[in-house]
A protein has these predicted regions:
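TRNA-recognition modules of translation machinery and tRNA-sensing kinases, especially anticodon-binding
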Residues: 1-410
Length: 410
C-alpha cells in the first residue's frame, strides 16, 4: 500500500470542516483590513531563500527541500512566504503602484525538513500578511493587532511577546559584545550554538538547551546597545498597542529564526509557551533581493498549530437531521432536505437504510439541534413531527409550514 510521505497529512471529515471555518475567518478579517490576496509559486530559485532568509539560518542549512530540475536550475520548495512575496513585489514593480503601501496576504503550503511532531510537519500551511512601503510605527501596531485579533476571533487567548532588535548598526555592535562574552564559554555551549557563535550569534539567545540557560542569563542585554532612534521607534509601537488594548510582554531574548528582521519582532504565544505565529519589520529585505530600498513589516501563522489548539466541538454540528425509513418517507425527506439547504440550513438524512434507532444515534453523533421525524401516519394527516434534540420536546407542524418553522427555531 502506498502511504503519504512522513510529515504530511490528509485533511478530511471534521478536520476539513474546521479548516474551512478557520480560512473563512481569515478571509473576513483580511477584507476588513483591506489586504489583497496574493499567490506565489510553491517552488522558487534556491538563491531567493539563501539571500532572503540567510545563508547561515537553520532553515537554509538544514531544512529546505532543494532540487535541480531538468534544465539544471537550482530550486527549493518554499519554507516560508515572505521572500516569495518580496520577489513578486520587485518583479512586478508593485513599488510603482498608485496605492501605497502595498498590503497583501497569502494562505498556502510551506515545506521544511524537520522532525515531525505536534504542530510541526514537513508540509504545513501558513497564512500571513506583508505590508510594503510604510515605515510608520502605526503600521507595525496594525500588523500586530491584526494577527492578535484573528486568533482572538478563533477563540485563542494569546499574548504578544515583542522585542526590539534595533537597527543594523545596533545589532552589529551587540553581536560583537555577545561573541566576546560567549567565547570563553564556547565548550559549555551545545554543538549548534558553537557553530552559531561564528555564523549567527543572535540565534544562541533562542536556544532551548537547558544546560546553557545560566550562561545566557548573564549575557549582555541587547537593550544596552540600542540607539535613541531604535528605542523611540519601539516605544511608539508599545504606546499604540496600549491604546489598542493588546495584551503584550517585552521579551529581550526573542530573536526569531530569520535573518531579515530588524527593529521590531514579535510572536503570538499561547499559555506562555507555544508560538502560533509571529513576524516583524524587515526594512532591508527588498533591497537585498535586488529591489529598491523599501520598508516593510509582516507576520505569518501556522494553521495546523491554530487548529490543534482550538475547541472543535461546535464544528461538527448540523441544524436538522431528517429521519425516514420507508420509500414514502424517503421521497418526502429528499424534498425537505433540498428545501432546507436552499434556505442555508445545514441538514442530513438517512441514505444508508438505517433503522430509526440507528438514525437517532447518528443524529446525536452529528450534534443535530433538531430532528424531523417522518412517519406515514403523520404524513397522511399533512403533519410532520419536529423534536428539539436538546430539550427533547416534540411538536406537530403542518407539512406546508415545516421550512418556516425550522427557520424560526434554529
Amino acid at each position: 500500500m502506498i502511504q503519504r510521505p512522513k510529515g504530511t497529512n490528509d485533511i478530511y471529515g471534521r478536520e476539513a470542516k474546521i479548516w474551512k471555518c478557520v480560512e473563512a475567518v481569515i478571509d473576513q478579517v483580511m477584507e476588513k483590513y483591506n489586504y489583497n490576496y496574493i499567490r506565489t509559486p510553491i517552488f522558487e530559485s534556491s538563491e531567493l531563500f539563501h539571500r532572503g532568509i540567510g545563508e547561515t539560518t537553520d532553515i537554509v542549512t538544514k531544512e529546505t527541500y532543494d532540487f535541480v530540475d531538468r534544465g539544471d536550475r537550482h530550486l527549493s520548495l518554499r519554507p516560508e512566504g515572505t521572500a516569495g512575496v518580496c520577489r513578486s513585489y520587485i518583479e512586478n514593480k508593485m513599488y510603482g503602484d498608485a496605492n501605497q503601501p502595498v498590503k497583501v496576504y497569502y494562505n498556502g503550503t510551506m515545506y521544511r525538513y524537520e522532525r515531525p511532531g505536534l504542530g510541526r510537519n514537513r508540509e504545513f500551511t501558513q497564512f500571513g500578511v506583508e505590508c510594503l512601503g510604510s515605515d510608520d510605527e502605526m503600521m507595525d501596531a496594525e500588523v500586530i493587532s491584526f494577527s492578535y485579533n484573528i486568533l482572538k476571533e478563533l477563540g485563542l487567548d494569546v499574548t504578544v511577546k515583542i522585542n526590539n532588535l534595533g537597527s543594523v548598526e545596533d545589532r552589529e555592535n551587540y553581536k560583537k559584545a555577545l561573541v566576546e562574552y560567549l567565547t570563553p564559554h564556547i565548550n559549555d555551549l551545545c554543538e549548534d550554538c558553537q557553530n552559531r557563535i561564528k555564523t549567527n550569534p543572535l540565534r544562541i539567545l533562542d536556544c532551548k538547551v537547558d544546560d546553557q540557560s545560566e550562561i545566557l542569563k548573564n549575557a549582555p542585554s541587547i537593550l544596552d546597545y540600542h540607539s535613541k532612534e531604535s528605542n523611540d521607534r519601539f516605544n511608539k509601537i508599545l504606546t499604540y498597542l496600549d491604546y489598542l488594548d493588546i495584551d503584550y510582554e517585552v521579551d529581550n531574548t526573542l530573536v526569531r529564526g530569520l535573518d531579515y528582521y530588524d527593529y521590531m519582532v514579535y510572536e503570538l504565544k499561547l499559555n506562555d509557551s507555544l508560538a502560533l505565529g509571529g513576524g516583524g519589520r524587515y526594512n532591508h529585505l527588498v533591497k537585498n533581493l535586488g529591489g529598491p530600498e523599501v520598508p516593510a513589516v509582516g507576520f505569518a501563522c501556522g494553521i495546523e498549530r491554530i487548529i490543534n489548539e482550538m475547541n472543535d466541538e461546535s464544528f461538527n454540528n448540523i441544524d436538522v437531521y431528517v429521519m425516514c425509513v420507508n420509500d414514502e418517507e424517503k421521497i418526502k425527506a429528499n424534498i425537505i432536505t433540498q428545501d432546507l439547504r436552499l434556505n442555508n440550513i445545514i441538514c442530513e438524512t438517512n441514505v444508508m437504510g438505517k433503522s430509526l434507532k440507528a438514525q437517532f444515534k447518528e443524529a446525536d453523533n452529528m450534534n443535530a439541534k433538531n430532528l424531523i421525524i417522518l412517519n406515514s401516519e403523520d404524513l397522511s394527516k399533512g403533519l410532520i413531527t419536529v423534536k428539539d434534540n436538546v430539550t427533547k420536546e416534540e411538536v406537530k407542524v403542518p407539512e406546508d409550514e415545516i421550512i418556516d418553522y425550522i427557520l424560526g427555531v434554529i
